[in-house]
Amino acid sequence: MALDQQAKAKIRAEYATVEGDTGSPEVQVAVLTKRIADLTEHLKVHKHDHHSRRGLLLLVGRRRRLLNYVQKKDINRYRSLIERLGLRR
C-alpha cells in the first residue's frame, strides 16, 4: 500500500533535519512507520492476505535495520526518534 505524495510530504516536513531532506534515516523510518500502520489496518480487515503480510514483515525488518543504524550512530537521535514516533523499542 503506497502512500500518496501529500502524506509523504507531510511526514518529510515533520521529520526532516534540513529543508528538502528526503533520505535521512529519521524521514525513512517515519515513512516506513506510516506504511506499516496502514498495512496493519488493511490486514485487520483482510486476514488471509498473506502476500501483504509478507510485505509488512519486510517493511518491519527494513525499519528495524534503519533504527539499529541510527542507534549506533547517535543514541540521542535514536531516543528522540522512537519517542516522536511512539515506538516501544
From Swiss-Prot:
Lineage of source species: Bacteria, Bacillati, Actinomycetota, Actinomycetes, Micromonosporales
Quaternary structure annotation from Swiss-Prot or TrEMBL: Part of the 30S ribosomal subunit. Forms a bridge to the 50S subunit in the 70S ribosome, contacting the 23S rRNA.
Protein name, as recorded: Small ribosomal subunit protein uS15
Pfam families, A to Z: Ribosomal_S15 (PF00312)
Species annotation: Salinispora tropica (strain ATCC BAA-916 / DSM 44818 / JCM 13857 / NBRC 105044 / CNB-440)
Gene Ontology CC annotations of this record: cytosolic small ribosomal subunit
Keyword rRNA-binding: yes
Originating gene: rpsO
Keyword 4Fe-4S found: no
PANTHER family on file: RIBOSOMAL PROTEIN S15, BACTERIAL AND ORGANELLAR, SMALL RIBOSOMAL SUBUNIT PROTEIN US15M
GO molecular function: rRNA binding; structural constituent of ribosome
SMART domains: Ribosomal_S15 (SM01387)
Function: One of the primary rRNA binding proteins, it binds directly to 16S rRNA where it helps nucleate assembly of the platform of the 30S subunit by binding and bridging several RNA helices of the 16S rRNA.
Domain of life, source organism: Bacteria
UniProt xrefs under InterPro entries: Ribosomal_uS15 (IPR000589), Ribosomal_uS15_bac-type (IPR005290), uS15_NS1_RNA-bd_sf (IPR009068)
Similarity annotation: Belongs to the universal ribosomal protein uS15 family.
GO biological process, one term: translation
Record-linked CDD domains: Ribosomal_S15p_S13e
Record keywords: Ribonucleoprotein, Ribosomal protein, RNA-binding, rRNA-binding
